[in-house]
Amino acid sequence: MKMGRRTQTVHHGYRRRRAEEQPDYEVVIVFDPKGDADLLKRMYVECERAGRLDEFYVFHLGHPDLSARYNAVGRFGRISEVATRVAGQLSGEGNSAAFREFAWRFVNIIARALHALGIRPDYQQILRHVVNIDALFVEYAQKYISEHDPRAWDTIIQIEGKLNDKNIPFNMKGRPLRVVAIDQYLTQKRIADPVMEGLKSAVRYDKTYFDKIVASLLPLLEKLTTGRISELLSPNYADLNDPRPIFDWMQVIRKRAVVYVGLDALSDTEVAAAVGNSMFSDLVSVAGHIYKHGVDDGLPGSLASGKVRINLHADEFNELIGDEFIPMVNKAGGAGVQVTAYTQTMSDIEAKIGSRAKAGQIIGNFNNLFMLRVRETATAELLTNQLPKVQIYTSTPASGANDAINN
């Protein structure tokens, strides 16, 4: 379904007021699950023809040495968006819903603490502290206590010196003594700090029980941090020797850039889907910010700006689709996002998302539907069932023949 010229939008530019002005190009973002080299080459050629190579970004999981870098949780309007983007990819069906809610809360605790420490969240940081929350608890406690009561460390050291296996609470067994001492000090002083309270509640879980309830979160994070992928999704902003650019969606939109996203799904479908969904979730968040505040919000001397047309092309989008894609097609239009999706059959969408109702919701939110060589009956009926019925009053048979020699 929905076929078209994906590279044509590279040349689109808004009308110029004066001939000497540069055209105000449209944003073009192409998601390609397979990472097709021909499509990438075509986009490169069209960007060169349009004079847009300086604003052309290539993100490709199959070529980490050449790929740009991207942090899906590094930019946010509200800190809670970090937890939503991570936990939103977990299953919410049946008994899994409770584990997803806990995962959201725990990731939110980590993200708030990192933000308070001045550390930009990324998947590597989140995984590190999911596995070992104690280090983050101690680090934030050092910052908080040094700012509010530097002499408290003498008391904490005294408490730590008196601890042994007999007087450590059962739920704190297996925790470092420094963690137990800080927890007891904070309980005595009744310190009211939301971030500190969240971390304290996390370390108070029995360690064995805690490991069980975060077990559903670890596979997702390991998919996003294993091997060279970690370099792309958790970029080191302080490494000045790395020539690979780092981009985010707001930067792309403000620069009217062109982005090619190759997810290398033939090599690893699970990682491709996880990365694609995280990008969609981030883009939905940016669209919400643009809808409320405009594109240039926060820039010096900026005024309320109009919408920028954002052309989003998702090839074989059934490979990428998830709950994050639904608000993209039914709400992001208010921020200027125009989604063009390409797939073969409706069954592909339904099989991926696991719900016929959600599949119908996604398809129903597209304004236009184009079909070419459709083989599945259910897919063809998406078009034929919308055609009006007419009455045929007369039917006239006709036949003819031509002499090929005379013509």
Protein language model annotation of sequence segments:
Residues 332-353:
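Sensor-1/coupling segment of RecA-like P-loop NTPase cores
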